[in-house]
Amino acid sequence: ITIVGLIVGFTAPIIGAIADNYGNRMKWIYLFSALLIIGAFSSWFGLPDGSNWQWILVSFGIGFVGAELAYIFSNAQLPSLGNRSETGAISGSGFGFGYVGGLVSLVIVLTLFVEQENGKTLIGFDPIFGLNAEAKEGTRFVGPFVALWFIIFSIPYFLWINDKPKPRIGASFGSGLKDLWKTVVSLRDKKSTVRYLISNMFYRDSLNGLYSFGGVYAA
C-alpha cells in the first residue's frame, strides 16, 4: 500500500500538469478507468485463506492507481463544465453523489453478497446468484461488483461529457513539467495553499488507510 501511495504521490503532480496542457483528457480517463476495472475484477481470484496475497495486493494496487490518476484528469475538466461561479457546485455535487453511491453499494453487498461466519448475509440470506458461501464467493464478488457498479454509473458521464478542447500551442510533456515547476516555485508566496496541501495529504492518507484496513478490522 505504501509503494502504491508513493507511485501516485510522485506521478500525480506530473500527470496533473500534463492534464492541464493536453486537449483531449477523455482518452486518459478511459485508460485509467480500465486499470480500475481490471484491478477490481481481478480481486475475485483472491483466495479466502490468503495464500495468494501477492495477487490481492497487486490487484488492489492496479485499481487504486487507476482510480487516483483518472480522478486527476476528471478534476482537470471542471473549468470546462461550467462558469467559474458554478465550479464549486459541480464539484460538490459530484462528491455528494459519489458518497451516496458508495453507501448504497455497501448496503447492497452486505445484505446480498458478503457472507458472515454462519454462511448467511447480514440479513440472513444466502449469497445471491448461487455464490458458494463456503468458498467465500460472496465476499470475493465484491471486487467484480465494484467494477460493474463503476461501469454502469460511468455511462452517463462518458456519454454527456464532450471534452475535446484544442490543445495549447506547444503543449507537450516538457511544457507540463515547466508549468509544474512554476507552480512549485510560486508556493513560496502562498503559505495558506501550502498548509492546505499538507493537511489534505494527511487527510487523504487517513482515508486510504481506513479504506485499506477497515475491512480487515470489520472482519
What are the functions of these language-model segments?
Residues 1, 212-219:
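Short amphipathic helix-loop junctions that connect adjacent transmembrane helices
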Residues 7, 64-68, 91-120:
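Glycine-rich segments within core transmembrane alpha-helices of 12-TM secondary carriers
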Residues 161-198:
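Juxtamembrane intracellular "pre-TM" segments in multi-pass secondary transporters
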Residues 1-17, 38, 103-106:
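Central cavity-lining transmembrane alpha-helices of secondary-active solute carriers
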Residues 19-34:
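Cytoplasmic membrane-interface "Motif A"-like loop-to-helix N-cap segments
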Residues 105-118, 147-166:
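C-terminal membrane-cytosol helix-exit motif in multi-pass small-molecule transporters
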